[in-house]
Amino acid sequence: MSYSRSVYSSSSVVGGSPYRSLSSAPRFIPSSSAASVHAGAGGSGARISVSRVSSVGSGFGGGYSGVSNVNLIGGGQNEKETMQDLNDRLASYLERVRSLEAANKKLEVQIRQHTEKKGPSKDWSPYYKTIEDLRKQVFDSTLENSQLVLQIDNARLAADDFRVKYEAEMAIRMSVEGDITGLRKLIDDTNVSRMNLENEIESLKEELIFLKKNHQDDVTELQAQVARSAVTVEVDAPKSQDLGKIMTELRAQYDGLAQKNRDDVEKWYQSKVDEHTVQVNLDTEALHSAKSSVTDLRRTVQSLEIELESLRNQKASLEGTLHDTEARYAMELEMLGGTAMAMEAELVQVRSDCQRQQQEYQALLNTKMKLEAEIHTYRRLLEGDGSFDLQDAVPTVTTQTVKKVITTTQRIVDGKVVSESNDTEVLKS
């Protein structure tokens, strides 16, 4: 951002005599031009044309060229005619003076009205309400912006909390899934062990059946042998043991042993089955609990994802609202800056108009004073003052230099003119 100032100055010379220089001539030739006043609508842009009156006296013996005192009292027909002509011209001149005074008064009224309407005023009370409204708008905008920033911060913190919770729940979910994978592997191992035990039981059953069949074959064979060898031999030896009884006892022993083995096998099998059944039940319960936990965790994750998505949407909407608000207030600030620049330009224009009107008023006042001095001179001529000096008739030539300095201030941002203001200063010398 840079500032550039350019100063333009112009000078003009205001003053000088509104009369032509007096010189000796054969006749008294006054020349005059009536003043005219032209004003635009609203009293602005007034243009004033001041009459210039010059008179060249003759018939006074060429006294205006080098004589300081002129005696107007003398005899002769030429002097009477000259005085009569002078009186007539003075009457017309006084009439013009009255018209100029009336025009001057009218112009003063217009200047006063214009000054009251558009002139600089020290009463800034009408602008206080606008300033207070603008301050209130700026304060409300700042407060709303702070609230939006606070809401965004709260939403960001809530999103961070939900992200942390989501990561924690995700870690728990991963650990539970790992436990479930381990339990599934354990269930597979248990199923393999159960199948092996079932196969072993089947093999033991087949072996038991084979043993029973062999035992039955042995018993049958022994019975057949006993039946075939039924020979009665009587000796004096002591009475032999009863083979049937012995076989019965053997059969009973074998049956008891087989039954014992069968009972042992059944007990062992039943214990193994019960043990594996308990383990399977425990594994099944753990699997059901893990499945329910996984289902709950999935529902929790879904709800957290939905809530996170809603928070993201809310954050996006808040950011969009913030951008829209910033853009709107930037436009409003730009409009207010343009209004302030326009008011500054209008103030500069009003000051320039006031200075110009003051200069015009001063010029009119100088003209009026010169006209009054000329009227006073004519009155002295009419009264026949013998001590009339030519320098009294010739108005004093005053030269006034008016220097106008125009200062232009431009505010440049990135090579573009953002604001521009003009300040006009009038210097008199």
From Swiss-Prot:
Stretches for region Linker 12: 223-246
Domain of life (superkingdom): Eukaryota
Region of interest (Head), residue spans: 2-78
CC per GO annotation: intermediate filament
Sequence segments annotated as region (Tail): 386-429
Keyword Coiled coil on entry: yes
Cross-referenced PROSITE patterns: IF_ROD_1, IF_ROD_2
Ranges for domain IF rod: 79-389
InterPro entries reported for this sequence: IF_conserved, IF_rod_dom, Keratin_I
Record region (Coil 1A): 79-114
SMART domains associated with the record: Filament
Disulfide bonds, paired cysteine numbers: none
Keywords: Coiled coil, Intermediate filament, Keratin, Phosphoprotein
Segments of this protein annotated with the region Coil 2: 247-385
Residues annotated as site: Stutter: Y329
Residues under site feature: Cleavage: D236, A237
Presence of the UniProt keyword Protein biosynthesis in the record: no
Region described as Linker 1: 115-130
Function per UniProt: When phosphorylated, plays a role in filament reorganization.
Remaining remarks: There are two types of cytoskeletal and microfibrillar keratin: I (acidic; 40-55 kDa) and II (neutral to basic; 56-70 kDa).
Subunit (UniProt): Heterotetramer of two type I and two type II keratins. Keratin-18 associates with keratin-8.
Protein family per UniProt: Belongs to the intermediate filament family.
Protein name: Keratin, type I cytoskeletal 18
Organism this protein belongs to: Xenopus tropicalis
Gene name tied to this protein: krt18
